[in-house]
Amino acid sequence: MRPILLSGHERSLNQIKFNRDGDLLFSVAKDKIVCAWWSANGERLGTYSGHQGAIWTVDVSPNTVLLATGSADNTVRLWNVKTGECVKVWDFPTAVKRVAFNPDGSRLLAVTEKRMGFLGTIAVLDINYGDSQGGGLENQADEPSLRITCTESKATVAGWSYLGKYIIAGHEDGSVSQYDGKTGEQLENVQAHEFDHQINDIQFSQDRTYFITASKDKSAKLISSRNLAILKTYVADTPLNSATITPKKDYVILGGGQAAMDVTTTSARQGKFEARFYHKVFEDEIGRVRGHFGPLNTVDVHPNGTAYASGGEDGYVRVHHFDKPYFDFMYEVEREQLRK
Protein backbone atom coordinates (compact mmCIF):
# COMPACT_ATOMS: atom_id res chain seq x y z
CA MET A 1 0.00 0.00 0.00
CA ARG A 2 2.09 2.89 -1.26
CA PRO A 3 1.00 6.25 0.05
CA ILE A 4 0.61 9.35 -2.09
CA LEU A 5 2.39 12.17 -0.29
CA LEU A 6 0.65 15.54 -0.56
CA SER A 7 2.80 18.47 0.46
CA GLY A 8 0.91 21.72 0.13
CA HIS A 9 1.16 23.01 3.68
CA GLU A 10 4.04 24.62 5.52
CA ARG A 11 2.66 23.91 8.98
CA SER A 12 0.88 21.10 10.76
CA LEU A 13 -2.44 19.79 9.44
CA ASN A 14 -5.64 20.41 11.39
CA GLN A 15 -8.32 18.61 9.39
CA ILE A 16 -8.76 16.75 6.12
CA LYS A 17 -12.05 15.90 4.47
CA PHE A 18 -13.18 13.86 1.46
CA ASN A 19 -16.23 15.14 -0.38
CA ARG A 20 -19.29 12.94 -0.71
CA ASP A 21 -18.20 11.56 -4.10
CA GLY A 22 -14.70 10.89 -2.81
CA ASP A 23 -12.97 12.41 -5.85
CA LEU A 24 -11.75 15.45 -3.92
CA LEU A 25 -9.83 15.83 -0.68
CA PHE A 26 -9.69 19.13 1.21
CA SER A 27 -7.02 19.91 3.77
CA VAL A 28 -6.52 22.78 6.21
CA ALA A 29 -3.52 23.57 8.36
CA LYS A 30 -2.09 26.22 10.64
CA ASP A 31 -0.75 28.13 7.62
CA LYS A 32 -3.94 30.04 6.61
CA ILE A 33 -4.45 28.07 3.42
CA VAL A 34 -7.05 25.54 2.25
CA CYS A 35 -5.90 23.01 -0.35
CA ALA A 36 -8.07 20.95 -2.69
CA TRP A 37 -6.62 17.73 -4.13
CA TRP A 38 -7.70 15.01 -6.52
CA SER A 39 -7.83 11.98 -4.25
CA ALA A 40 -7.05 9.47 -7.01
CA ASN A 41 -3.57 10.72 -7.89
CA GLY A 42 -2.80 13.40 -5.32
CA GLU A 43 -2.69 16.23 -7.83
CA ARG A 44 -3.42 19.62 -6.34
CA LEU A 45 -6.53 21.22 -7.76
CA GLY A 46 -6.09 24.60 -6.17
CA THR A 47 -6.16 26.63 -2.99
CA TYR A 48 -8.63 28.92 -1.24
CA SER A 49 -6.93 31.92 0.34
CA GLY A 50 -8.39 34.67 2.48
CA HIS A 51 -8.13 33.58 6.11
CA GLN A 52 -5.87 35.64 8.37
CA GLY A 53 -5.08 32.95 10.93
CA ALA A 54 -4.61 29.22 11.40
CA ILE A 55 -7.53 27.26 9.93
CA TRP A 56 -8.86 24.73 12.42
CA THR A 57 -11.58 23.04 10.45
CA VAL A 58 -13.10 22.38 7.04
CA ASP A 59 -16.25 20.75 5.67
CA VAL A 60 -17.69 20.41 2.20
CA SER A 61 -21.41 20.42 1.35
CA PRO A 62 -22.95 17.09 0.23
CA ASN A 63 -23.30 18.37 -3.37
CA THR A 64 -19.70 19.72 -3.44
CA VAL A 65 -20.89 23.23 -4.29
CA LEU A 66 -19.81 24.98 -1.10
CA LEU A 67 -16.84 24.63 1.23
CA ALA A 68 -16.88 25.94 4.80
CA THR A 69 -13.82 26.72 6.91
CA GLY A 70 -13.40 27.91 10.49
CA SER A 71 -10.33 29.75 11.64
CA ALA A 72 -8.39 31.36 14.48
CA ASP A 73 -9.16 34.74 12.86
CA ASN A 74 -12.65 34.33 14.43
CA THR A 75 -14.46 33.82 11.14
CA VAL A 76 -16.31 31.13 9.25
CA ARG A 77 -15.83 31.47 5.51
CA LEU A 78 -17.98 29.94 2.80
CA TRP A 79 -16.27 29.23 -0.52
CA ASN A 80 -17.46 28.34 -3.99
CA VAL A 81 -15.68 25.00 -4.51
CA LYS A 82 -15.47 25.37 -8.29
CA THR A 83 -14.21 28.94 -8.61
CA GLY A 84 -12.35 29.28 -5.31
CA GLU A 85 -13.99 32.59 -4.45
CA CYS A 86 -15.12 33.39 -0.93
CA VAL A 87 -18.89 33.99 -1.05
CA LYS A 88 -19.54 34.78 2.63
CA VAL A 89 -17.72 35.62 5.86
CA TRP A 90 -19.36 35.28 9.27
CA ASP A 91 -17.62 36.97 12.20
CA PHE A 92 -17.58 35.48 15.70
CA PRO A 93 -16.19 36.82 18.99
CA THR A 94 -13.72 33.90 19.32
CA ALA A 95 -11.96 31.29 17.17
CA VAL A 96 -14.01 28.66 15.34
CA LYS A 97 -12.82 25.14 16.09
CA ARG A 98 -15.24 22.98 14.08
CA VAL A 99 -17.67 23.40 11.19
CA ALA A 100 -20.05 20.72 9.86
CA PHE A 101 -22.81 20.65 7.26
CA ASN A 102 -25.98 18.73 8.09
CA PRO A 103 -26.78 15.69 5.88
CA ASP A 104 -28.72 17.66 3.25
CA GLY A 105 -26.36 20.65 3.32
CA SER A 106 -29.06 23.16 4.28
CA ARG A 107 -27.49 24.10 7.61
CA LEU A 108 -23.97 24.54 8.91
CA LEU A 109 -22.89 24.35 12.53
CA ALA A 110 -19.88 26.21 13.92
CA VAL A 111 -18.28 25.48 17.29
CA THR A 112 -16.70 28.57 18.85
CA GLU A 113 -13.94 28.71 21.44
CA LYS A 114 -14.36 29.77 25.08
CA ARG A 115 -12.11 32.83 25.48
CA MET A 116 -11.87 36.42 26.67
CA GLY A 117 -15.03 36.20 28.76
CA PHE A 118 -17.08 34.62 25.98
CA LEU A 119 -18.58 31.19 26.61
CA GLY A 120 -18.15 28.42 24.06
CA THR A 121 -21.11 28.16 21.69
CA ILE A 122 -22.46 26.08 18.83
CA ALA A 123 -23.97 28.37 16.19
CA VAL A 124 -26.17 27.06 13.38
CA LEU A 125 -26.21 28.97 10.08
CA ASP A 126 -28.81 28.47 7.35
CA ILE A 127 -27.20 27.87 3.95
CA ASN A 128 -28.60 29.08 0.64
CA TYR A 129 -27.50 27.46 -2.64
CA GLY A 130 -28.78 30.20 -4.95
CA ASP A 131 -30.04 29.21 -8.39
CA SER A 132 -29.20 26.13 -10.45
CA GLN A 133 -26.52 28.05 -12.41
CA GLY A 134 -24.52 28.62 -9.23
CA GLY A 135 -25.48 32.29 -8.98
CA GLY A 136 -26.74 33.90 -5.80
CA LEU A 137 -24.43 31.96 -3.48
CA GLU A 138 -23.60 35.30 -1.80
CA ASN A 139 -27.15 35.65 -0.46
CA GLN A 140 -26.55 34.06 2.92
CA ALA A 141 -28.17 34.97 6.23
CA ASP A 142 -26.00 37.24 8.37
CA GLU A 143 -27.01 35.83 11.76
CA PRO A 144 -27.17 32.25 13.06
CA SER A 145 -30.67 30.77 13.18
CA LEU A 146 -29.80 28.94 16.39
CA ARG A 147 -27.23 29.38 19.15
CA ILE A 148 -26.42 26.77 21.78
CA THR A 149 -24.31 28.04 24.69
CA CYS A 150 -22.16 25.55 26.58
CA THR A 151 -22.34 26.79 30.17
CA GLU A 152 -20.66 23.77 31.79
CA SER A 153 -17.74 22.59 29.65
CA LYS A 154 -17.04 24.03 26.21
CA ALA A 155 -17.70 21.93 23.12
CA THR A 156 -14.52 21.04 21.21
CA VAL A 157 -16.14 19.14 18.31
CA ALA A 158 -19.66 18.60 16.98
CA GLY A 159 -21.62 17.03 14.13
CA TRP A 160 -25.11 16.16 12.92
CA SER A 161 -26.89 12.85 13.47
CA TYR A 162 -29.14 11.13 10.91
CA LEU A 163 -31.59 13.49 9.14
CA GLY A 164 -30.01 16.39 11.05
CA LYS A 165 -32.26 15.43 13.94
CA TYR A 166 -29.67 15.89 16.68
CA ILE A 167 -26.52 17.89 17.09
CA ILE A 168 -23.94 15.74 18.85
CA ALA A 169 -21.08 17.54 20.60
CA GLY A 170 -17.90 16.36 22.30
CA HIS A 171 -16.65 18.45 25.21
CA GLU A 172 -13.42 19.46 26.87
CA ASP A 173 -14.34 17.49 30.01
CA GLY A 174 -14.65 14.21 28.07
CA SER A 175 -18.45 14.18 27.91
CA VAL A 176 -20.73 13.87 24.88
CA SER A 177 -23.97 15.86 24.55
CA GLN A 178 -27.01 15.44 22.35
CA TYR A 179 -28.98 18.57 21.41
CA ASP A 180 -32.23 18.89 19.51
CA GLY A 181 -31.31 19.98 15.96
CA LYS A 182 -34.26 22.37 15.69
CA THR A 183 -34.57 23.95 19.15
CA GLY A 184 -31.03 23.52 20.48
CA GLU A 185 -32.33 22.07 23.74
CA GLN A 186 -29.93 19.65 25.48
CA LEU A 187 -31.50 16.20 25.57
CA GLU A 188 -28.70 14.03 26.88
CA ASN A 189 -25.19 14.22 28.32
CA VAL A 190 -22.93 11.21 28.88
CA GLN A 191 -19.45 11.07 30.41
CA ALA A 192 -18.03 8.99 27.58
CA HIS A 193 -14.33 9.47 28.31
CA GLU A 194 -12.24 9.97 31.44
CA PHE A 195 -13.10 13.22 33.17
CA ASP A 196 -11.07 16.22 31.93
CA HIS A 197 -9.63 14.34 28.95
CA GLN A 198 -10.96 16.33 26.03
CA ILE A 199 -12.60 14.84 22.97
CA ASN A 200 -10.49 15.71 19.93
CA ASP A 201 -12.64 14.32 17.14
CA ILE A 202 -16.08 13.00 16.33
CA GLN A 203 -16.93 11.28 13.04
CA PHE A 204 -20.16 9.60 11.99
CA SER A 205 -20.96 6.33 10.24
CA GLN A 206 -22.31 6.70 6.70
CA ASP A 207 -25.94 6.53 7.85
CA ARG A 208 -25.13 8.75 10.86
CA THR A 209 -26.86 6.41 13.32
CA TYR A 210 -23.65 6.01 15.31
CA PHE A 211 -20.36 7.83 15.61
CA ILE A 212 -16.82 7.45 16.92
CA THR A 213 -15.02 9.77 19.32
CA ALA A 214 -11.27 10.13 19.83
CA SER A 215 -9.95 11.43 23.12
CA LYS A 216 -6.85 12.44 24.98
CA ASP A 217 -7.58 9.57 27.41
CA LYS A 218 -6.01 7.14 24.86
CA SER A 219 -9.28 5.56 23.80
CA ALA A 220 -11.92 5.83 21.10
CA LYS A 221 -15.60 5.01 21.63
CA LEU A 222 -18.34 3.95 19.26
CA ILE A 223 -21.56 5.61 20.41
CA SER A 224 -25.19 5.49 19.26
CA SER A 225 -26.60 8.81 18.00
CA ARG A 226 -30.07 8.01 19.28
CA ASN A 227 -29.45 7.59 23.01
CA LEU A 228 -25.66 8.04 23.38
CA ALA A 229 -25.23 4.40 24.46
CA ILE A 230 -21.56 3.38 24.32
CA LEU A 231 -21.40 0.43 21.94
CA LYS A 232 -17.66 -0.28 21.66
CA THR A 233 -14.36 0.92 23.14
CA TYR A 234 -11.01 0.87 21.34
CA VAL A 235 -8.04 1.20 23.67
CA ALA A 236 -4.76 2.62 22.39
CA ASP A 237 -1.48 3.38 24.15
CA THR A 238 -1.22 7.01 23.12
CA PRO A 239 -3.50 10.08 23.13
CA LEU A 240 -5.83 10.02 20.10
CA ASN A 241 -6.45 13.05 17.89
CA SER A 242 -8.75 11.56 15.31
CA ALA A 243 -10.87 8.51 14.50
CA THR A 244 -13.01 7.43 11.57
CA ILE A 245 -15.29 4.54 10.62
CA THR A 246 -14.55 2.68 7.37
CA PRO A 247 -17.38 1.81 4.97
CA LYS A 248 -17.26 -1.61 3.18
CA LYS A 249 -15.20 -3.26 5.93
CA ASP A 250 -15.97 -3.32 9.66
CA TYR A 251 -12.92 -1.39 10.78
CA VAL A 252 -12.18 1.87 12.49
CA ILE A 253 -9.02 3.91 11.95
CA LEU A 254 -7.48 5.83 14.84
CA GLY A 255 -4.78 8.48 14.56
CA GLY A 256 -2.73 9.97 17.35
CA GLY A 257 0.69 9.96 18.93
CA GLN A 258 2.39 11.73 21.77
CA ALA A 259 1.49 15.41 21.77
CA ALA A 260 4.11 17.39 19.87
CA MET A 261 5.22 19.18 23.02
CA ASP A 262 5.74 15.91 24.93
CA VAL A 263 7.99 14.24 22.37
CA THR A 264 11.45 13.64 23.81
CA THR A 265 12.88 11.17 21.33
CA THR A 266 13.10 11.36 17.56
CA SER A 267 12.35 7.69 16.92
CA ALA A 268 9.00 7.41 15.17
CA ARG A 269 8.39 4.07 16.91
CA GLN A 270 8.75 5.71 20.32
CA GLY A 271 6.22 8.42 19.62
CA LYS A 272 3.73 5.87 18.23
CA PHE A 273 2.98 8.02 15.18
CA GLU A 274 0.96 5.46 13.26
CA ALA A 275 -2.54 5.06 11.94
CA ARG A 276 -4.10 2.15 13.82
CA PHE A 277 -6.73 -0.14 12.37
CA TYR A 278 -9.11 -1.82 14.80
CA HIS A 279 -11.89 -4.28 14.10
CA LYS A 280 -15.12 -2.36 14.64
CA VAL A 281 -17.01 -5.28 16.16
CA PHE A 282 -14.31 -7.21 18.04
CA GLU A 283 -12.33 -4.18 19.26
CA ASP A 284 -8.98 -5.82 18.42
CA GLU A 285 -6.13 -3.95 16.82
CA ILE A 286 -5.45 -5.56 13.44
CA GLY A 287 -2.75 -3.39 11.92
CA ARG A 288 -0.81 -0.16 11.81
CA VAL A 289 0.37 2.06 9.02
CA ARG A 290 3.53 4.03 9.65
CA GLY A 291 4.94 7.00 7.79
CA HIS A 292 4.24 10.27 9.56
CA PHE A 293 7.07 12.01 11.37
CA GLY A 294 5.07 13.35 14.30
CA PRO A 295 1.55 12.82 15.62
CA LEU A 296 -1.41 12.25 13.30
CA ASN A 297 -3.80 15.16 13.76
CA THR A 298 -6.58 14.04 11.46
CA VAL A 299 -7.76 10.96 9.54
CA ASP A 300 -10.59 10.57 7.05
CA VAL A 301 -11.76 7.69 4.90
CA HIS A 302 -12.97 7.65 1.29
CA PRO A 303 -16.80 7.36 1.22
CA ASN A 304 -16.51 4.16 -0.86
CA GLY A 305 -14.12 2.67 1.67
CA THR A 306 -11.39 2.26 -0.95
CA ALA A 307 -8.81 4.63 0.53
CA TYR A 308 -7.98 6.66 3.58
CA ALA A 309 -5.94 9.79 4.22
CA SER A 310 -4.10 11.10 7.26
CA GLY A 311 -2.72 14.55 8.05
CA GLY A 312 0.10 14.99 10.52
CA GLU A 313 2.04 17.43 12.62
CA ASP A 314 4.75 17.08 9.94
CA GLY A 315 2.73 19.12 7.42
CA TYR A 316 2.07 16.23 5.04
CA VAL A 317 -1.13 14.54 3.98
CA ARG A 318 -0.72 10.87 3.09
CA VAL A 319 -3.36 9.18 0.94
CA HIS A 320 -3.41 5.37 1.00
CA HIS A 321 -5.43 3.41 -1.55
CA PHE A 322 -6.19 -0.01 -0.07
CA ASP A 323 -4.84 -3.19 -1.68
CA LYS A 324 -6.71 -6.43 -2.23
CA PRO A 325 -5.55 -8.12 1.03
CA TYR A 326 -7.23 -5.32 2.98
CA PHE A 327 -10.61 -6.31 1.54
CA ASP A 328 -9.91 -10.07 1.73
CA PHE A 329 -8.92 -10.09 5.40
CA MET A 330 -11.60 -11.67 7.59
CA TYR A 331 -12.02 -13.22 10.99
CA GLU A 332 -12.93 -16.91 11.02
CA VAL A 333 -16.41 -16.07 12.39
CA GLU A 334 -16.99 -13.64 9.52
CA ARG A 335 -16.01 -16.35 7.03
CA GLU A 336 -18.45 -18.78 8.59
CA GLN A 337 -21.23 -16.18 8.32
CA LEU A 338 -20.46 -15.86 4.61
CA ARG A 339 -20.53 -19.63 4.05
CA LYS A 340 -24.02 -19.79 5.52
From Swiss-Prot:
Component of the eukaryotic translation initiation factor 3 (eIF-3) complex. InterPro entries: eIF3i, WD40/YVTN_repeat-like_dom_sf, WD40_repeat_CS, WD40_repeat_dom_sf, WD40_rpt. Component of the eukaryotic translation initiation factor 3 (eIF-3) complex, which is involved in protein synthesis of a specialized repertoire of mRNAs and, together with other initiation factors, stimulates binding of mRNA and methionyl-tRNAi to the 40S ribosome. The eIF-3 complex specifically targets and initiates translation of a subset of mRNAs involved in cell proliferation. SUPFAM superfamilies: WD40 repeat-like. One of its GO terms (molecular function) is translation initiation factor activity. HAMAP family: eIF3i. The gene is tif34. It holds the Pfam family EIF3I. It comes from the Eukaryota. This is Eukaryotic translation initiation factor 3 subunit I. GO terms for biological process: cytoplasmic translational initiation; formation of cytoplasmic translation initiation complex. It is found in: Cytoplasm. It comes from Aspergillus fumigatus (strain ATCC MYA-4609 / CBS 101355 / FGSC A1100 / Af293) (Neosartorya fumigata). Keywords: Cytoplasm, Initiation factor, Protein biosynthesis, Repeat, WD repeat. Belongs to the eIF-3 subunit I family. WD repeats lie at residues 8-47, 50-91, 150-189, 194-233, 291-330. SMART domains: WD40. One of its GO terms (cellular component) is eukaryotic translation initiation factor 3 complex, eIF3m.
